[in-house]
A protein has these predicted regions:
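Residue-level signature for tetratricopeptide repeat
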Residues: 23-27, 56-57
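Solenoid-like repeat scaffolds
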Residues: 8-15, 38-47, 74-78
Length: 96
């Protein structure tokens, strides 16, 4: 899936079934369903999922937990990046 296709999918009421888990997590996060996004990334054990896990905790305001997950992903806490910028960056890393 390409970037614009993903963005267009956000106009739909349900998540496209073909999305892999990390993209599904970003989709649900964009739709305001933080808990669902969090549940999805908890089930995946890779660097991308850890980055998204960090992002959702940062969005929640749980910086301590977010820093833990950034560390697991080999990343640093993005002090100067907005949540919107980080979400977009994560998406671009996955779909180009």
């Amino acid at each position: 899936m390409r970037y614009q296709e993903f963005m267009d999918s956000l106009d739909q009421d349900s998540c496209p079934s073909a999305l892999e888990p990390c993209l599904r997590a970003l989709w649900f996060d964009a739709k305001g369903e933080w808990d669902t996004a969090h549940e999805i990334v908890q089930q995946v054990d890779d660097v991308t999922a850890a980055r998204i896990h960090a992002y959702v905790h940062r969005k929640e305001g749980d910086d301590w937990n977010a820093r833990y997950w950034y560390g697991r992903a080999g990343s640093v806490f993005p002090e100067k990046m907005s949540l919107k910028e980080e979400w977009n960056s994560l998406l671009l890393e996955m779909v180009g």
